[in-house]
Curated annotation (Swiss-Prot):
Annotated organism of origin: Arabidopsis thaliana (Mouse-ear cress)
Name of the protein described by the UniProt record: Acyl carrier protein 5, chloroplastic
Residues of the signal peptide: none
Originating gene: ACP5
Processing and modification events after translation: 4'-phosphopantetheine is transferred from CoA to a specific serine of apo-ACP by acpS. This modification is essential for activity because fatty acids are bound in thioester linkage to the sulfhydryl of the prosthetic group.
Residue(s) carrying O-(pantetheine 4'-phosphoryl)serine: 94
SMART domains the record matches: PKS_PP
All copies of domain Carrier, residue ranges: 59-134
Amino acid sequence: MATSFCSSISMQAPFSATTTRFCLNKQATIFNNEKTNNLSFSLRRLMPARLAVSCAVKQETVEKVSEIVKKQLSLTDDQKVTAGTKFTELGADSLDTVEIVMGLEEEFGITMAEERAKEIATVQQAAELIEELVQEKTA
């Protein structure tokens, strides 16, 4: 998670005046070069921003992966599994993850390299890898 801060300095003249810009903490600040009556400083904290990056995978692939994960982990129908759900959040250990990968390979008719399979931690990551492998298989 990234947090950013903003600092600003402003001075105002009663009449129009030429201005000079400079950067303070990567924010543009304007100073008036003429006589000024007002000088103000303000610091404000900006809201933290979270970025999410994901590839466009078919919703049906995500749904199939979710179903297989629920089946392999013996989850009830009321337990929600979304694209961002981590296997560890569902109580899966490394053996469970291997079983999930085996179920995915069987369902989609693909073979995952062990190194690539170890990188899968979420439903989204599994769906992305599956679509990539299916494309490679058909190409």
